[in-house]
Amino acid sequence: MTREEIHDLALSKIDMTKYMILELITGFGKSKLAIDLINHICDRVFRNNECPTILILVSKTVHKQTWKDEIKKWGGIKSNHITIECYESLKNYENSCFDIVVADEMQHLSEARIDVLETIHINESFIGLSATIKRDMRDYFIHSHKAEVIKCGLKEAVEDEVLPEPTVYLLPLTLDTTIYTYKVKKFGRDIITTQKGYYDSISSLIEWYKNKYFNSRNERMKNLWLSTAGKRLKWCAEQKEALVLHLLDKFRNYKTLTFCSSIEQSERLGKYNITSKNKASVKNLEMFNLNKIKHITACNILNEGVNLTNCRIGIFCNLNSSEIVVKQRVGRILRHKSPIIIIPYFKDTREEELVQKMIEEYSKDSIISVDSINDIKL
């Protein structure tokens, strides 16, 4: 369906259901659609002298301003009683009453938060927004509240020309096997090994923790397994920093967003980084959207709820095992009319497995594998 068809479908369904979930790909325009639905309800239910109460839930404090900007951008909401609150503070609204509740990025509704939500008396409508809702949460709202779910994933959005199809450049790399500079501990001794040797060593440790967990169901082993796997992906990202700096230099005249593995890596790869640690993050984002700067780097803060203007290139220095995070990150780039995604990755590693999952929804014609950054053409 086109954007207009989904918009009309949602408007036609909102009068017949109290709970609606808009499961739409990042970049689709969920906030605008939610604002239109709110105003439709206001026109249908409330008289001129009445003012509906609206609660909008967001995942982070920075997203409160994003919603204020969106409301202003799309002509306002027909109410003076609008509360924008973070999910962390939802418990403060237990047993409260609102005419309309909007749950932005509703994947943040944990079981405990859903319990609080169930105590809120919603007079007219609950509207959930997400590109990445989990199946069990979707099923809960369908079975408990007969929720109407309207979906549009990445593949459908591209096929129906709701979003542009990006050109995806894959840049396969090989771990070095000749230079001995990496230290690992084996049999209680420090051993100097190669890049490939270090990767194999940490992978063996991950498998050991994993097997220990499945044999014992010891939660400590599970935590060690998952945390070490995360450290492995972070290490892989760090090995690509020199390459990414070359990419940023090559595309210095194009608006580029680089996804990093940590705040520290965001700082190393970009002067204008957007992180929870950087007090200038909001200013950097504004300058980027106003085209005053070309490059920004980020780790997690740009995964959701933040709008980017005309970003042409997305560089995935860090690969994430979370399908939710991957979809959110790709959505940051698909607002440009001809987006480019560049994914450098190490062959025969966990990264290669993640890349294969990432590109499943793209057509084969849009994926180009290159041997050198010089082969990437815009």
Where are these regions (language model features)?
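A short beta-strand element within the Helicase C-terminal
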Residues: 98-102, 295-299, 303-320, 325-326, ...
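Conserved pre-motif I regulatory segment
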Residues: 1-23
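Conserved helicase ATPase core of P-loop NTP-dependent helicases/translocases
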Residues: 65-69, 255-259, 264-306, 325
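Post-DEXD/H (motif II) to motif III coupling segment of the RecA-like Helicase ATP-binding lobe
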Residues: 108-168
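Interdomain linker/hinge connecting the two RecA-like lobes of the SF2 helicase core
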Residues: 18-21, 154-255, 260-261
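Inter-Walker segment of RecA-like/P-loop motor cores
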Residues: 57-97
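Conserved segment of the helicase C-terminal RecA-like domain
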Residues: 332-360
